[in-house]
Amino acid sequence: SQQGHHVTTKADATADRDGCVQWRLRDLQPGTRYQYEIEFAGQPLVQGDDYFFETAGSNKSSTTVRLAFGSCAREDKGSSAVWRQVRAVDPHAVVLLGDTPYIDSVDLAVQRRRHAEFAAVPDFRKLLRNRSLYATWDDHDFGRNDTDGNLEGKERSRRAFIEYRSNPSYGDGRSGIYTKFR
C-alpha cells in the first residue's frame, strides 16, 4: 500500500479448477491503494505501476462510487471499444449482467474454454487489471438461449462460472450465483 503495508498470499493453480486461482487477502485497510505483482517460481509474471487495486472505504465513510454495468459482450472489436470507453471513465468496479461470454452449452470443457477466451481479450484484461469485477449470468452463459433454472447440466455451468468469476459469494453455496457487496 501507499503506507508501506505489505501483504503476501499464495494460491495454487490446479487442473481441477482449470488453472484458475483466487487470492483471499486479509487485514487490508479501507480506502487504501495497493500495488500488486504476481510471481511464479520466484519470477514476476505481472508487475508495474498499472497493477494495483483500491479497497472500498469504511462503512462509516461517505464517498462517491462509480460502477460500470455491462452485458452481451463478445471477443470482437465492438466489445473491445466498449471496454476501452469503460476504462476511460475510471469506474471503481465493473458489474457484468450476463451473456459474458456467449457459450450456449453446459459442457464443462466448452464452458471453461469460452470463459478463458473471454478473459483473454486484451482490452477486457486491461480494464480489470485494477478494478473489482462482479458478475451474474444470463441464458447464453448459463446454458442455451432462453433457458431457465431447470436446465439439465446447469451445475457444470455454475462450476465454470465460479472458477472464472471471483464474486464474494455464490448463491446459497449449493446453487445460484447471486452475491452481496456488504
Language-model features, listed with the residues they occupy:
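Acidic, histidine-bearing metal-coordination/catalytic regions of metal-dependent phosphoesterases
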Residues: 1-73, 88-90
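Active-site neighborhood of divalent metal-dependent phosphoester/pyrophosphate hydrolases
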Residues: 4, 61-182
